[in-house]
Amino acid sequence: MDISEKLEKGYEIAQWRDDPWSPEGRKRYESALKKFGKLSQHPWLTELTSSDKVSILDLGAGRGIGGVALAKVLANKGLEVELTIIDLRESAVRDSLKFAKEKGVKAKAYKMDAVEAYRLGRFDLVLMYGAILAHFDSWALPRLFASAAEALEEKGVVVVEEMDRVHVIFMSKFKEFIVENPKPEALSISVHAGYDPVKGSYLRNYIRVKDWEVVTLPVNFRSISTIASTLWLFLKDIDIVKTETENLYLVLGKTPRRLLKPEHLEEPTVVKRGKPWNFL
């Protein structure tokens, strides 16, 4: 089972809130509209949207809640918006187009690895919304940010929504066992299954209780400062915006350095081996 199939299965089992037609998904969409409405007042966004047209690239978009919300906010300001959505899940790609159409947003969508997204050209806004960074290990994150920076127009802006996951775990402790979906008809849980010291990933088994189907996925936890400082390697200026939700932030970046391109980041020896070298 490749990573796209594992993600399909993981989202199916845990039923994370990326379905825009569910009550939880509608709530997320309304929250995103409000969030981006306020973000549009940031000086970097004000400068960027002073023209009459803007292009958006939504990386790891899921079913498009974040990208469609951002597009709607900018369209309501009178801008012509072109939205490009990419995700590794085939079902999410299909649903994102359906959702965008329902909301009157002009969109294209591709099943594609976000690390390869720079091949699609350059955009005014590159968005990473929701839990996308949790799917990228410590070696994949620089590749993701290199791709985002390379896909950015010279005066463009990168927008990353993320939790300060290290702070959350430090304050509340790491949980071995989590109820992912409490609904009786779709009850699912996750259980800690190990740790990969090379990639910095915590492995979790996601289990659907009614048939005990299991998929193992890596999860990655970072602080907001780590995300911001890593993005800074690829973009000259960085800002952090606090949202109304506790421990949830928007990290902004602008002015691509273009010194380190995605194709320069070849796998190092330790990642190829998959484990530390043992001198014993």
Features from the language model and the residues they span:
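SAM-dependent methyltransferase
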Residues: 160-228
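Conserved class I S-adenosyl-L-methionine
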Residues: 1-53
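C-terminal lobe and adjacent flexible extensions of AdoMet/dcAdoMet transferase-like proteins
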Residues: 233-280
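Class I SAM-dependent methyltransferase "Motif I" SAM/SAH-binding loop
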Residues: 60-64
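A short glycine-rich, Lys/Arg-flanked "PGG" loop and its adjoining helix->strand segment in the class I
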Residues: 142-154
